[in-house]
Design a protein with these regions (language model features):
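Short hydrophobic alpha-helix segments
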Residues: 38, 115, 152-154
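Transmembrane alpha-helices
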Residues: 1-9
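Thiol-/selenol-based redox modules, centered on thioredoxin-like
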Residues: 128-182
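Structural microenvironment flanking redox-active thiols in thiol-disulfide oxidoreductases
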Residues: 60-112
Length: 182
């Protein structure tokens, strides 16, 4: 029951195949400016697509990554947290965590649609009352190298299972993606 209940029954997105380029998309940064995903190609990037502040498992995952921010920063790697939640919730998350990550709002879930990680009407019933949109994103982590090529992707099929931050660090080391921070 527990595994069945928490399964997304998802298929891997063909847009996130290792070795391919991360498709281009636009999101808003916390200042409300439109940012193109290609602007992250200057350094390796850990992209964490999360459902929003309402999801306790997403928040646990993000807090674990935030606790490792010094190690990640020392590697010269960017972290982009992307969610389709309301922009005010993204700003709130950035203020609460106070780490040098890129906090992004995926307006109308356009980035998730581009990447094939958008389950229509995936938000639990009742969350709309709190200002969340009915559509959400499937929790996904993508690591891109400098230039935007995908070197690793985790598309969980069980919303309770997320990779630990050490896995990201191991991938970055194993792929030789450490760029000393300046």
């Amino acid at each position: 029951y527990a595994y069945w209940y928490s399964s997304f029954n998802r298929q891997p997105s063909p847009q996130l195949e290792v070795g391919s380029m991360l498709p281009g998309f636009e999101v808003l940064d916390i200042a409300g400016r439109t940012v193109n995903s290609g602007s992250f190609n200057d350094r390796p990037t850990i992209w964490i697509f999360h459902r929003g502040n309402w999801c306790p498992l997403c928040m646990a995952q993000i807090k674990e990554v935030a606790s490792q921010y010094r190690d990640i920063q020392a590697m010269g790697v960017r972290v982009a947290l992307v969610s389709p939640q309301s922009h005010k919730y993204t700003i709130d998350l950035a203020q609460r965590l106070d780490v040098p990550f890129e906090f992004m709002t995926d307006v109308c879930n356009r980035a998730a649609k581009t990447l094939g990680i958008d389950p229509p009407c995936g938000l639990p019933m009742g969350m709309q009352v709190l200002g969340y949109d009915s559509d959400t994103v499937l929790p996904t982590v993508v690591i891109t190298e400098q230039g935007g090529r995908i070197v690793w992707a985790h598309e969980t099929d069980n919303y309770r299972v997320r990779p630990e931050p050490e896995i990201y660090l191991d991938v970055l080391r194993d792929k030789g993606l450490i760029v000393p921070a300046t």
